Regions:
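Short, solvent-exposed coil/turn segments at beta-strand boundaries
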Residues: 41-44, 90-93, 126-135
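Short solvent-exposed loop/turn micro-motifs enriched in small/polar/acidic residues
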Residues: 24, 79-80, 118-121
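Short beta-strand edge/turn micro-motifs at domain boundaries
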Residues: 4, 117-149
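Hydrophobic alpha-helical segments typical of transmembrane helices
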Residues: 25, 37, 69, 122-124
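Short, cysteine-centered beta-strand-loop-beta hairpins and adjacent loop/turn segments enriched
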Residues: 79, 103-116, 148
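A solvent-exposed, acidic/Ser-Thr-rich amphipathic alpha-helical stretch
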Residues: 7, 19, 38-91, 99-104
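Short, low-complexity N-terminal intrinsically disordered segments enriched in polar/charged residues
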Residues: 1-47
Length: 149
């Protein structure tokens, strides 16, 4: 049986206006990320946003945490590029899948830089806060594998 949280998500009403608002905010977020605009990214997030990378235990909370997430990510992978491959937008938020290319030039998630040019697949869920009309963060799922020695 689904939890109350899941039932609430499934029962969220879907309107064209809400869909457009979510899509436009995602576009704003994506453009800010492409432009390395941290303030622009933060403008799309709730103050209590949470960022996670599945399977790593990594977690960043609030605007301070989101700033650290992006600073660390963009330092580790300064040439990171997301090529959108799939997207779903609904009243629960946005789910995207992207092919990511990047060079690993600094420490990321306890992994020292390798200098390797990487190609990986990411799926990212941006949960929507209908009251704030902002995203509540990102849940990142990736097939990134680091060398184990």
């Amino acid at each position: 049986m689904a939890s109350e949280r899941i039932l609430e998500l499934m029962r969220r009403p879907s309107t064209a206006e809400e869909h457009d608002a979510i899509r436009e905010l995602w576009k704003t977020h994506s453009k800010a990320e492409d432009n390395r605009d941290i303030a622009g990214l933060l403008s799309t997030l709730t103050r209590d946003c949470v960022y996670t990378v599945a399977g790593t235990g990594a977690r960043w909370e609030g605007h301070e945490g989101a700033t650290r997430f992006y600073t660390e990510l963009l330092t580790a992978f300064p040439d990171i590029h997301f090529e959108l491959d799939y997207i779903v937008i609904g009243p629960q938020g946005v789910c995207e899948e992207a092919i990511v290319t990047a060079t690993h030039e600094a420490r990321w998630l306890d992994h020292e830089p390798t200098g390797a040019k990487l190609t990986l697949r990411n799926a990212i869920f941006f949960p929507w806060d209908p009251e704030a009309r902002l995203f509540k963060g990102e849940m990142v799922y990736t097939d990134l594998q680091f060398p184990t020695g």
